């Protein structure tokens, strides 16, 4: 056992002894259930922070606060609540039992304090401790007592401690909540109806991904955690709800990375009588307005860059983007869609770029891999990439002028994809054929290919109006708004391998 662990265990034992003493003296004081708080710290700072010492003395304002003890310096405590921090002062009026209980306080304890509001000589607000109650005894010391909470893995595993001691983490999740609320309000103002669709599917669909499999005991059948809500949302459009959206979790049984977590949050929406061009316009309007509302500016720092949500956003086809970011590659510069349709040409090109190939990859998959390796990381400013091949877009409508590609886009910023949208395929026969092609791809070894969904085909046969739909990755969007570079920093409890 290390000296560090021994010291920590000693402190835990001391704190347990203090709690046992409280239980012995008065069991009701060990974990009291009631404390009436009149103000949060930030409210007091906002209302009285500009008053002079003399004005506060004359006012004689009584307040009641509650929060966690973050520092104890002689008679002064620093108390933190959800809004911020304020001091409490245990001066000469603190005598007898109150003084003894104050001396037993530890950093991390949760307390309530009542008393008059004052201003210190340094200009800091504080509450004179005229009445005090221990609300919860913290049995474990906060990490900065020893080494601080700087280890990233510990921050993710013990998010509750991370939130206590790291203001940056608290602010990131406050911003996340604001981003989600702003998106929801924007969609409602645009007359979209918020809906909820199943989280467990009999047939996984709506995206190309490997699903999580579970078992329904009562029905004795396999079910799948949803990889996307798309097919259910489009059923609602068939049913007559012309504008719908859902903000919820998706689950994909894939690897962990700075951009991927097995469960993640998406906002997915569908609008009848619109196409993918309308979606791009709506996305520009949404993101620029949210940035201005939440940050006061359409521009925000992201790493070494400044990204500008103000618009208009760049729009390039996938082929154009590959050519733009490979200016020295003569083969790419001369490449045409006819060559893109040649699988051997595409395999040779991908190999020449150092891309490890899978046997089952189609021409579209090869084009997407080349794009992902050579162009995607360079898309720092908001950019719509269009012209996605039909063989990697099984739910998107074919382009009228080039049936090799679809009316689909993905939205990139900060070098990563944030959104995916397209004009929906509403031709039931074409959808049937594409589902069958996906089944063949799965049989050939592509475990992310889609399943055949006969009920969805039936829904399309009832008539889906011209419709466009889009999914926006909330986690990746929040990464931009908080200037963070790993998805784990914006998910409260990210997936972690169990500790040994």
Curated annotation (Swiss-Prot):
> What's the name of the protein?
Lysine--tRNA ligase
Record Gene3D superfamilies: Bira Bifunctional Protein, Domain 2, Nucleic acid-binding proteins
Molecular-function GO terms, alphabetical? ATP binding; lysine-tRNA ligase activity; magnesium ion binding; tRNA binding
UniProt keywords (A-Z) are: Aminoacyl-tRNA synthetase, ATP-binding, Cytoplasm, Ligase, Magnesium, Metal-binding, Nucleotide-binding, Protein biosynthesis
Cofactor(s) it depends on:
Mg(2+)
Database matches in InterPro entries:
Aa-tRNA-synt_II (IPR004364), aa-tRNA-synth_II (IPR006195), aa-tRNA-synth_II/BPL/LPL (IPR045864), Lys-tRNA-ligase_II (IPR002313), Lys-tRNA-ligase_II_N (IPR044136), Lys-tRNA-synth_II_C (IPR018149), NA-bd_OB-fold (IPR012340), NA-bd_OB_tRNA (IPR004365)
Please name the Pfam families in this protein's record: tRNA-synt_2, tRNA_anti-codon
Task: Name the Enzyme Commission number(s) assigned to this protein.
Answer: 6.1.1.6
**Segments traversing the membrane:** none
Main EC class the enzyme belongs to: ligase
Question: Which reaction equation describes what this protein catalyses?
Answer: tRNA(Lys) + L-lysine + ATP = L-lysyl-tRNA(Lys) + AMP + diphosphate
Q: How does it assemble?
A: Homodimer.
Query: The organism sits in which domain of life?
Result: Bacteria
Q: Where in the cell is it found?
A: Cytoplasm
GO cellular component terms given for this protein: cytosol
Q: How is the cofactor bound?
A: Binds 3 Mg(2+) ions per subunit.
What family is this protein classified in?
Belongs to the class-II aminoacyl-tRNA synthetase family.
Annotated residues that bind Mg(2+) 1 are located at: 410, 417
In which residues is Mg(2+) 2 bound? 417
Q: Its Gene Ontology biological processes?
A: lysyl-tRNA aminoacylation
Q: Is DNA damage a UniProt keyword of this protein?
A: no
